[in-house]
């Protein structure tokens, strides 16, 4: 039996992270490499990164507890 390939962790370019803001609060975002998400602490949302592309749509974001 073979194990499925692990999802390669990607990083977000620092300059891109400086430019991107939360579309809800216009506040800063933090990169969570393990979950491949951009976190908005102000909005309590986690925006997914799919195939290296941040999905900055509030309806696609995961709500944080």
UniProtKB/Swiss-Prot annotation:
Entry superkingdom: Bacteria
Organism from which the protein derives: Rhodopseudomonas palustris (strain HaA2)
Signal peptide: none
Name of protein: UPF0434 protein RPB_0294
SUPFAM superfamilies reported in the protein's UniProt record: Trm112p-like (SSF158997)
Family membership noted in the UniProt record: Belongs to the UPF0434 family.
Cited Pfam families: Trm112p (PF03966)
GO cellular component, one term: cytosol
Gene3D superfamilies: 2.20.25.10
UniProt xrefs under InterPro entries: Trm112-like
């Amino acid at each position: 039996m073979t194990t499925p390939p692990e999802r390669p962790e990607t990083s977000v370019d620092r300059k891109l992270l400086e430019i991107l803001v939360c579309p809800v609060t216009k506040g800063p975002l933090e990169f969570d490499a393990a979950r491949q998400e951009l976190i908005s602490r102000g909005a309590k949302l986690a925006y997914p990164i799919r195939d290296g592309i941040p999905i900055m749509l509030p309806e696609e974001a995961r709500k944080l507890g």
